Amino acid sequence: LRKHGATATANICAEAVQLYPALGRDLVARGFEISCHGRRWETPLGLTEEEERKWITDSVAAIESVCGVRPVGWHCRCPHTVNTRRLLIEEGGFIYDSDAYDDDLPRFFADTPSDRSQPHVILPYSLDTNDMRYQLAAAGFPTATQFTEYCCDAFDWLWDEVRKTRRLRRFYAKNDHFTKTGSGQTQGKLKIETCFLSGR
């Protein structure tokens, strides 16, 4: 990323960064943009509107207290609720969310309130270069080498396209999740997944 002058986004869960604060501070020190992945890798489905609002604000506060900066992006485990995007906009500090799987290109959210200085951006999430494909027996990746090659090819293609079209695209590398077991042990690795390619 440094070689190409690209920015990167760390999509992190609040509990994960609280468990490993040095990693969160290091990401910021290295210039990573911080995006919130929720409190844990969980869906807000089933929460009341007020519970979801608190879930969002608590997640933001936890990340900001560790990293020293607030997250500017959001992507929770699907499915999100009918309230999620509106609550993110009302919270006021998010530039974009990635709770969409319906397109390859980003877009402005048409219902962004007119009093905002800039429209809210929907930056669709792609499962194509996500570790989700490890879970598919027929179309999955049996080896790390194959997955790495696939991701590198996708990155190279997107990088070339950005240079030609000047469009913003999103790329995901392998994402590992923190999980807390019943015994209180933590398993997994810090989730660092996103590169924004703007062609600027």
Question: How would you describe each model-predicted region?
Answer:
Residues R70-P71, L136-Q146:
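Surface-exposed cleft-lining segments at the edges of enzyme active sites
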